[in-house]
């Protein structure tokens, strides 16, 4: 099968690497290079880096809609299918209609739940216990096309955006390789999504990165997991930004009236204990403004915390 692959982040690179030896990948389309990290260096996407290493031609159009030059490039390559995984732009219908098998998308959710750009983050943020991948026939709507296959996995208590992305990328690649021969042979007919069950997963906003210490402790934990390993959940301590990347929640009831966000315990095994709505949030991995990530012991030793101090 002659395939043009559309993808950008690490999630997409893992899928590409896994399917590479099984398909004839004749071109790769990825987002234009963007500034990344503290130094804001212009860096290629993980998918582009893989393509360069393998000597595959890379295309990085700024826009797709109305781009006649790009349309003709895809047409001239005569692909059998476009495979898309976290590309980051909506692919116009005229491009999807070029190959006989159209566009086939690997989406990191159990469709029709969590359509959109951030299904992994949203599933974690909402404390879901299960997620999965869907292989979908693409159409002009955002993740609205009929579904070829779905595979589900549990979300474990210690899963974060990083670990779950890797699991779902591997799951998606395996499922894709399973269904592609069936699609080619006409043995697999995609099933339309139930619109009444649809939900959306827009990118997380900057406001959603800020910890509200008055929230349910389990919800704060889910927020931290959804934002780890980057960009991190944000709070303020001693007037500066502090990011939290790992925490555990312990349900506990308090007699005394302690303000949420207050440090109430320091335990060299459990972490930094912060009072939240219905218990204690044990902070385990943190990053003070302008410094590297550190574990709670390094933070405790470096900052000499006082019981009664508050995160705001």
From Swiss-Prot:
CDD domains: FMT_core_Met-tRNA-FMT_N (cd08646), Met_tRNA_FMT_C (cd08704). Coiled coil: none annotated. Pfam families: Formyl_trans_C, Formyl_trans_N. It catalyses: L-methionyl-tRNA(fMet) + (6R)-10-formyltetrahydrofolate = N-formyl-L-methionyl-tRNA(fMet) + (6S)-5,6,7,8-tetrahydrofolate + H(+). InterPro entries: Fmt, Formyl_trans_C, Formyl_transf_N, Formyl_transf_N_sf, Formyl_transferase-like_C_sf, GART_AS, Met-tRNA-FMT_C, Met-tRNA-FMT_N. Keywords: Protein biosynthesis, Transferase. Its EC number is 2.1.2.9. One of its GO terms (cellular component) is cytosol. PANTHER family: METHIONYL-TRNA FORMYLTRANSFERASE, METHIONYL-TRNA FORMYLTRANSFERASE, MITOCHONDRIAL. Belongs to the Fmt family. This is Methionyl-tRNA formyltransferase. It comes from Dictyoglomus thermophilum (strain ATCC 35947 / DSM 3960 / H-6-12).
């Amino acid at each position: 099968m002659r395939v043009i692959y559309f993808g950008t982040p690490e999630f997409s690179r893992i899928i590409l690497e896994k399917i590479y030896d099984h398909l004839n990948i004749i071109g790769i389309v990825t987002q234009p290079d963007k500034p990344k990290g503290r130094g804001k260096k212009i860096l290629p996407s993980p998918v582009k880096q893989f393509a360069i290493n393998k000597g595959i031609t890379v295309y990085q159009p700024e826009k797709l809609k109305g781009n006649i030059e790009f349309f003709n490039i895809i047409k001239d390559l005569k692909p059998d299918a476009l495979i898309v995984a976290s590309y980051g732009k909506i692919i116009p219908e005229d491009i999807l209609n070029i190959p006989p098998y159209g566009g086939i998308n690997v989406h990191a959710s159990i469709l029709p739940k969590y359509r959109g750009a951030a299904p992994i983050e949203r599933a974690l943020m909402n404390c879901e216990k299960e997620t999965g991948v869907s292989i979908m026939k693409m159409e002009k709507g955002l993740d609205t096309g009929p579904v070829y296959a779905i595979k589900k996995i549990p979300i474990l208590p210690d899963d974060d955006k990083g670990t779950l992305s890797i699991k779902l990328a591997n799951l998606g690649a395996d499922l894709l390789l399973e269904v592609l021969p069936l699609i080619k042979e006409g043995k697999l007919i995609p099933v339309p999504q139930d619109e009444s069950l649809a939900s959306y997963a827009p990118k997380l906003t900057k406001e959603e990165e800020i910890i509200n210490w008055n929230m349910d402790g389990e919800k704060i934990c889910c927020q931290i997991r959804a934002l780890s390993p980057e960009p991190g959940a944000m709070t303020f301590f001693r007037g500066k930004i502090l990011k939290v990347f790992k925490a555990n929640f312990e349900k506990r009831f308090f007699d005394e009236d302690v303000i949420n966000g207050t440090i109430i315990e320091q335990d060299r095994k459990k972490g930094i204990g912060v009072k939240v709505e219905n218990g204690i949030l044990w902070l385990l991995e943190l990053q003070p403004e302008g410094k590297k990530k550190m574990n709670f012991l390094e933070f405790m030793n470096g900052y000499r915390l006082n019981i009664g101090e508050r995160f705001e």
